């Protein structure tokens, strides 16, 4: 049995107000487990996001993301103010956050917080970009590695492009994060060797 996604009719426009989440689809995985795909993030989702970002036992998350600083120690409101559009995958029975993704304007090749210098961090809120939009995604235990992310992110991309059809998407991260970069490749992203940072082992991939 393959994953199936059943869209929920809606007429939402972006950006959504802060702490707003609307169901846009039902996701049923290959084992028959049901999830809600949410556009936006309400306070319940953000609370889970913060808790998971602070979980130091999740070494994959801590080693490969800036979420401990971004969501655990930082302001969600400030992050959202940068034009971010979040999507959440929420397990229906337990209401647990299974995966989280976001899009938003960001200059091509601009690294995440984990890789920025102090001077670059001070400029983070002053970026002006319209053409290139970043895509970032996370999956959380115990749902990581269960075959959910490809279909979830593919659906999120299609939804986001309805609102921003001219946007060029890019992803970036640790070149050794085979799962994340492999997913990007399966989604049609292509590596940009000219943006590879050998010192920080950071790479970018684009989908134009």
Give the ranges of each region predicted by the language model.
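Alpha-helical interaction/dimerization surfaces of two-component signaling modules
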Residues: 52, 159, 183-187
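Short glycine-rich hinge loops at helix-strand junctions in the catalytic core
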Residues: 147, 164, 188
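Conserved active-site alpha-helix within GNAT-family acetyltransferase domains
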Residues: 150, 175-193
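GNAT-family acyltransferases
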Residues: 1-141, 197-208
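Solvent-exposed beta-strand sheet faces enriched in polar/charged residues
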Residues: 104, 170-172, 192
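A short glycine-leucine-enriched loop at secondary-structure breakpoints
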Residues: 136, 145-152
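Conserved beta-strand-loop-alpha-helix junction that forms the acyl-donor binding cleft
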Residues: 140-141, 169-181
């Amino acid at each position: 049995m393959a994953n199936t996604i059943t869209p929920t009719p809606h007429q939402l426009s972006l950006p959504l107000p802060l702490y707003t989440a609307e169901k846009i689809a039902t996701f049923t995985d290959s084992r028959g487990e049901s999830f809600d795909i949410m556009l936006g993030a309400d306070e319940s989702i953000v609370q889970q996001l913060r808790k998971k970002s602070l979980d130091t036992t999740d070494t994959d998350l801590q080693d490969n993301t800036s979420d401990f600083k971004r969501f655990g120690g930082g302001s969600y409101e400030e992050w959202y103010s940068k034009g971010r559009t979040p999507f959440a995958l929420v397990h229906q029975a337990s209401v647990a956050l299974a995966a989280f993704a976001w899009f938003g304007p960001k200059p091509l090749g601009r690294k995440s917080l984990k890789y920025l210098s102090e001077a670059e961090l001070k400029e983070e809120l002053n970026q002006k970009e319209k053409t290139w939009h970043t895509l970032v995604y996370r999956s959380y235990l115990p749902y990581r590695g269960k075959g959910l992310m490809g279909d979830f992110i593919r659906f999120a991309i299609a939804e986001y492009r309805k609102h921003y059809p001219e946007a060029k998407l890019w992803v970036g991260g640790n070149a050794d994060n085979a799962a994340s970069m492999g997913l990007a490749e399966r989604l049609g992203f292509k590596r940009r060797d000219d943006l590879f940072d050998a010192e920080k082992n950071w790479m970018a991939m684009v989908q134009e």
